[in-house]
């Protein structure tokens, strides 16, 4: 009886130890955030707000055949609405890779920073050419530019367009998974709609900021749905 009770206690102890170990291990499908936000100030109506999130947004679906065609039809970055001139900071340590690289869009000015973890961050729609040179090291939180307006008015739609790409610049990744921020709170307010386009043949796919596809630039459209919702008014 005593030996049986001791064996039972040992089994329970082993089970609890294993359970504790499993609970303290990070989930394999949940990558650790590697970067910070591109602003030093906290969000607010006088500083910045989340605009359009990354992914299969309703807005990107509507322009999938023109604005977003090169990115397989989805919004391949995150838009942060902010007044023109708002300082933009580097989201991580790195080295300046490109300045005003027109082949990557996001005019009137842009900046690309290569990070030691293999990612490249792109800062688009900057107000002026960044005062940086290729090869210059930058630190996380260092000012690297100022928010501009792609329409050159500063009253139309001033915002920062931020992308996270691979070193070859051929793939874009979901920044919501890589930037340490309270995205749940940031999604509550802002100037753009929060909806993601729904494929009624697979209605649960790509319906949150956490579940969005990587982009392969130049690849085929991935959201040209047969039965979309909201309906495609252009058809």
Q: How does the language model describe each region?
A:
Residues 3-12:
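Bacterial N-terminal signal peptides that target proteins for export
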Residues 13-22:
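Bacterial N-terminal signal peptides
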Residues 24-109, 140, 188-235:
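Surface-exposed, glycine-biased beta-strand/turn segments
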Residues 51-52, 58, 62-64, 123-126, ...:
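Short amphipathic beta-strand/extended segments with alternating polar/hydrophobic composition
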Residues 82, 129-132:
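Short alpha-helix capping/helix-loop boundary micro-motifs
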Residues 86, 121, 145:
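Glycine-centered loop/turn positions within well-structured domains
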Residues 91-130, 157-161:
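Zn2+-dependent peptidoglycan hydrolase active-site motif and core
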Residues 111-115, 136-206:
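Conserved, short, structured surface segments that act as functional micro-motifs
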């Amino acid at each position: 009886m005593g030996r049986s009770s001791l064996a039972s206690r040992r089994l329970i102890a082993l089970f609890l130890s294993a359970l504790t170990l499993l609970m303290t291990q990070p989930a394999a499908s949940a990558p650790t955030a590697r970067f910070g936000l591109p602003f030093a100030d906290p969000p607010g109506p006088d500083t910045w707000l989340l605009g359009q999130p990354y992914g299969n947004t309703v807005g990107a679906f509507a322009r999938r055949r023109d604005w977003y065609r090169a990115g397989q039809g989805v919004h391949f970055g995150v838009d942060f609405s902010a007044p023109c001139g708002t300082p933009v900071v580097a989201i991580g340590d790195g080295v300046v890779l490109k300045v005003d690289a027109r082949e990557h869009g996001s005019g009137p000015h842009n900046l690309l920073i290569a990070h030691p973890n293999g990612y490249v961050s792109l800062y688009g729609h900057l107000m002026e050419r960044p005062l940086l040179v290729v090869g210059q090291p930058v630190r996380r939180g260092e000012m690297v530019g100022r928010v501009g307006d792609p329409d050159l008015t500063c009253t139309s739609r001033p915002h920062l367009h931020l992308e996270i790409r691979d070193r070859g610049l051929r793939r874009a990744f979901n920044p919501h998974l890589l930037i340490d921020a309270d995205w749940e709170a940031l999604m509550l307010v802002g100037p753009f709609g929060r909806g993601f386009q729904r494929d009624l043949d697979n209605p649960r796919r790509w319906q949150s900021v956490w579940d969005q596809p990587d982009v392969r630039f130049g690849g085929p459209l991935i959201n040209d749905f047969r039965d979309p919702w909201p309906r495609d008014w252009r058809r």
